């Protein structure tokens, strides 16, 4: 990276990590569910994955790759009913959020507390069960805390690896690909498909991750550092995809 480029922010490292989620994806539908995953998906489309299909988040397929919140020429129609067809085909990669994730990848975005008498209602399970069963799923967590990365989720919305019956063909497409947080990049490549650290963002220590995770993180001592963006990637993030710096509202460090 050249000396003319200003210091890379934590949010920009997160954007790069989210873009790398789609590395090698090819011609599939990218469905990012928050600002930084959206920047990441569009960055991937402008660099390594030009065949990614992206939408406005409602019902229109973009012909171009606009900035966050901007309009662009439309090349197709993707109403909700067609999304179900894409989900069932497996040609989609969703990046969802999570209110809770456990070491096996079970995700909760439904409610806190007992199933029959929750103490706080959230979104409901939404599309999480179908997403996790049918196609690659990743998660984005903007604030990595022990409340989110917990021992046991209150309600399973997205299906984790300990729920899988390997003999049942219904689970054959289950694949939890990545978890990106404001502290690092993770997957479920630990023992018995448990949570594993792949890289920590520059300035983040292993102790910080351990202190903000309720369970042991596999591979934490050996995790590398999240890669540096290229000059072109930084230009695209700052000038093309997010000129209003919305990314810094999601991750401010």
From Swiss-Prot:
PANTHER family assigned to the protein according to its UniProt record, in alphabetical order = ACETATE COA-TRANSFERASE YDIF (PTHR43293), CHOLESTEROL RING-CLEAVING HYDROLASE IPDB SUBUNIT (PTHR43293:SF3)
* One BP term from GO: cholesterol catabolic process
Name it: Cholesterol ring-cleaving hydrolase IpdB subunit
Q: What happens when the gene is disrupted?
A: IpdAB double deletion mutant does not grow on cholesterol or HIP, but grows as the wild-type on pyruvate. In the presence of cholesterol, ipdAB double deletion mutant accumulates COCHEA-CoA.
Which EC numbers does the record give? 4.1.99.-
Q: What is the lineage of its organism?
A: Bacteria, Bacillati, Actinomycetota, Actinomycetes, Mycobacteriales
Consequence the record notes for mutating residue 126 to M: Loss of activity
Entry's family note = Belongs to the 3-oxoacid CoA-transferase subunit B family.
Pathway membership of this protein? Steroid metabolism; cholesterol degradation
Query: Does the record bear Repressor in its keywords?
Result: no
Q: Give the record's keywords alphabetically.
A: Cholesterol metabolism, Lipid metabolism, Lyase, Steroid metabolism, Sterol metabolism
One example of the protein's molecular function in GO is: lyase activity
Q: What does this protein do?
A: Involved in the final steps of cholesterol and steroid degradation. Opens the last steroid ring of cholesterol by catalyzing the hydrolysis of (3E)-2-(2-carboxylatoethyl)-3-methyl-6-oxocyclohex-1-ene-1-carboxyl-CoA (COCHEA-CoA) to 6-methyl-3,7-dioxodecanedioyl-CoA (MeDODA-CoA).
- At the top of the EC hierarchy, this enzyme's class is lyase
**Subunit structure as annotated in this protein's UniProt entry:** Heterotetramer composed of 2 IpdA subunits and 2 IpdB subunits.
Species of the source: Rhodococcus jostii (strain RHA1)
Tell me the gene name: ipdB
Q: Does the keyword Lyase apply?
A: yes
Q: Give the reactions, separated by semicolons, that this protein catalyses.
A: (3E)-2-(2-carboxylatoethyl)-3-methyl-6-oxocyclohex-1-ene-1-carboxyl-CoA + H2O = 6-methyl-3,7-dioxodecanedioyl-CoA
């Amino acid at each position: 990276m050249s000396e003319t480029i200003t210091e890379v922010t934590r949010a920009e490292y997160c954007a790069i990590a989210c873009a790398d989620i789609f590395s090698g994806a090819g011609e599939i539908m990218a469905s990012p569910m928050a600002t930084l995953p959206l920047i990441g998906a569009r960055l991937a489309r402008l660099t390594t994955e030009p065949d990614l299909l992206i939408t406005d988040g409602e019902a229109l397929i973009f012909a171009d790759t606009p900035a966050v919140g901007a309009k662009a020429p439309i090349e197709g129609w993707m109403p909700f009913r067609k999304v179900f067809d894409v989900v069932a085909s497996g040609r989609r990669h969703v990046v969802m959020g999570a209110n809770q994730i456990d070491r096996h990848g079970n995700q909760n975005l439904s409610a806190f507390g007992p199933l029959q008498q929750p103490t706080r209602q959230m979104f409901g399970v939404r599309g999480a069960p179908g997403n996790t069963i049918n196609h690659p799923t990743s998660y984005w967590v903007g604030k990595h805390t022990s409340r989110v990365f917990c021992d046991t989720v209150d309600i399973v919305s997205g299906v984790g690896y300990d729920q899988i019956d390997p003999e049942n063909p219904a689970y054959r497409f289950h694949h939890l690909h990545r978890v990106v947080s404001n502290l690092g990049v993770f997957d479920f490549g630990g023992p018995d498909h448990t949570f594993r650290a792949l890289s920590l963002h520059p300035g983040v220590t292993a102790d910080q991750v351990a202190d903000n995770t309720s369970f042991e993180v596999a591979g934490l001592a050996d995790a590398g550092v999240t890669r540096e963006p290229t000059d072109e990637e930084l230009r695209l993030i700052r000038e093309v995809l997010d000129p209003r710096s919305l990314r810094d509202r999601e991750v401010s460090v």
